[in-house]
From Swiss-Prot:
Belongs to the glycosyltransferase 2 family. Keywords: Glycosyltransferase, Ligase, Transferase. It is an enzyme of class 2 (transferase). The gene is yaiP. One of its GO terms (molecular function) is glycosyltransferase activity. Pfam families: Glycos_transf_2. The keyword Transit peptide does not apply. Its EC number is 2.4.-.-. It comes from the Bacteria. This is Uncharacterized glycosyltransferase YaiP.
Amino acid sequence: MKTWIFICMSIAMLLWFLSTLRRKPSQKKGCIDAIIPAYNEGPCLAQSLDNLLRNPYFCRVICVNDGSTDNTEAVMAEVKRKWGDRFVAVTQKNTGKGGALMNGLNYATCDQVFLSDADTYVPPDQDGMGYMLAEIERGADAVGGIPSTALKGAGLLPHIRATVKLPMIVMKRTLQQLLGGAPFIISGACGMFRTDVLRKFGFSDRTKVEDLDLTWTLVANGYRIRQANRCIVYPQECNSPREEWRRWRRWIVGYAVCMRLHKRLLFSRFGIFSIFPMLLVVLYGVGIYLTTWFNEFITTGPHGVVLAMFPLIWVGVVCVIGAFSAWFHRCWLLVPLAPLSVVYVLLAYAIWIIYGLIAFFTGREPQRDKPTRYSALVEASTAYSQPSVTGTEKLSEA
């Protein structure tokens, strides 16, 4: 039943997306300041900053060295020598990501600021920023883009996640905007804000998911949040199961803590259609999986449990989604890997059971994780518009 509901939702979202293709990006160049926090980002920082500085939509790029202990400061100095006044290098004692972003905001002079991460590839020769800026010009106070996956140099786990990540984010956040009035989150990897709005509310380090906390704060105060599905960026993913576990634990526990902090939102339109469905899907999924697995184990044994994890219609659906992702990333290996995306479903369910529900009542979060960075980013001169690998390229070069 849930698979058919998902198929109907997907068709509806596709039709809605096709209806928006006539919208044009803003052509107002040089009117956005980019702010990038950096803590021990030496391996990937230079290429990320170079791509941002080559983007004609940005007036200046502000990078805040948040007390790094590697060569981040030296990399920033080299970028400064190359780009001069268009690059603003700021160094401070470690305060956390929220504090670094707010310090960078002190140097912003444009009416709009774009926030991203040091490991994220932002295409310099596409109109993604233009589509976000167009939403601002239509009255939005903050706009979220789509964080996809950087596959160059990535291992097996990022490829598995990339099989469904982009289409699922587009579908979920579009549906949240239509029904709940705003997307669930403006990702820290791709968000644009009116500068005066961000200065008024700002980021807080009271949670480890400052982007989610800020999004919900803006919604609670009546600000207009929008989604720009044609602005796509490419952050690095975790290559090891341990780092992936820690990152998902931070996200899910942070989600639970934000529900605790924003109780007044829970039964609003946004809460009912954008916040609660994420949790209800988990609770429903856990119940269905446990019931199905138990029945299969009793009737057919362990192999029945394995077959229940990969029902034929579900495999077909995720392979279709994987085929789109494979075309988009120019990596056809994503099609056969698509059924393995169930690993991330089970990962999320397990973390919710172990940590998420407890965090809602205690408000306690783990320390912020720091995934291992790798230097294989796409450079501005790359022929393709997004990071890609071929089917014969090694999954990991890191």
